[in-house]
Amino acid sequence: MSTLKRAAVAAVAVVAMAAPAAPSATAAPVYKCATSTKDIDDTSYDGPWPDNWKVTVKTCAARSADTVYAYAEVRWDGASFHPVDDPTISDGAKLRVQIKQSREGTDPVVVERDFPGLEERLEDSTSSGARTGTYRTPTISHRAGAVALGDSVLFLDWHGDGRGYQRHDYTASPTV
């Protein structure tokens, strides 16, 4: 190989290594998340055993061009005095994932979706009665304006307390 060709190959290699990689058209969006935890009282129980559920929700959002994506992951550590796999702990449980337009004041919801599959998972337990678990929602998406965020709300309807769904708000994701 001639000296000129070697120099050209070396120059191309140096430029290729120094140049930043072009973003891929199919690159996955980078999610920004916020996590918060609440101790939630089982209002249908007033006996002697501890009945609070520690529930943590991580809410995540990402942007790709004009589209915002959001999902939530919920983790729980529930009261273990109930019978194994007791289907009467709650009458309903759902996690609502929202995409909001970030503005001064109240952020308006541009899209939301409820994921009701949580009730059966909360009532499931190990053979020793431990009620711990994790559930990640599917991702929702929506074309949103310049600044948006993901938010989530847990709705619990304890069996037999007569109060219906009680709302538990969690920390929204950082803006994207």
Language-model region placement:
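Post-signal peptide N-terminal regions of Sec-secreted extracellular proteins
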Residues: A27-V176
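Secretory targeting and sorting signals
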Residues: M1-A27
